[in-house]
């Protein structure tokens, strides 16, 4: 409730939990978009629209609007509480940009990296790798679970060039 989310993308595996959480909200409910995933069977749709349909319905003439202030929030992530109580972490545009540039330079990623997501995106906003990969026109390879067999299969199948890890 306190984050003020206006849109939420829902993985079908967690649709039940999200549906319950939405009933507990006191403020305005976010617009819910379902994300289909061929790697998961089950779950139910709780959203107003499916992700690919939402993208297809977009306005191709939409004019980009840069943030009014580089210190405005670009992302709000919630930790799982590994080292203490769960907490919300705000990333601002300036910080995401500077961190992404630092990742590019220090990581020597090159153009079009193929990145395997083993680092949770909620973990410091995935160390800002979502923005890093966007800047480099990289490929995101996602797993349903971080398991050794799935990781090696993804590496072979997609030609993974980079990944990060956290305990």
Predicted regions and their residues:
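Short hydrophobic/charged patches on amphipathic alpha-helices used for structural packing
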Residues: 1, 65, 149-152
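Conserved AMP-binding/adenylation subdomain of ANL enzymes
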Residues: 97-114, 122-162
């Amino acid at each position: 409730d306190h984050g003020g989310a206006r849109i939420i993308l829902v993985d079908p595996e967690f649709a039940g939990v999200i549906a319950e959480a939405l009933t507990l909200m006191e403020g305005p409910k976010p617009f819910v978009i379902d994300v289909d995933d061929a790697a998961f069977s089950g779950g139910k749709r709780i959203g107003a629209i499916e992700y690919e349909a939402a993208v297809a319905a977009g306005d191709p003439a939409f004019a980009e609007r840069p943030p009014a202030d580089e210190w405005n929030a670009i992302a709000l992530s919630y930790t799982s509480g590994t080292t203490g109580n769960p907490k919300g972490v705000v990333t601002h545009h300036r910080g995401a940009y500077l961190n992404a540039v630092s990742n590019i330079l220090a990581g020597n990623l090159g153009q079009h990296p193929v990145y395997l997501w083993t680092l949770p995106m909620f973990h410091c906003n995935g160390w800002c790798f979502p923005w890093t990969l966007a800047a480099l026109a990289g490929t995101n390879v996602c797993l349903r679970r971080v398991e050794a067999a799935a990781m090696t299969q993804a590496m072979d199948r997609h030609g993974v060039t980079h990944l990060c890890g956290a305990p």
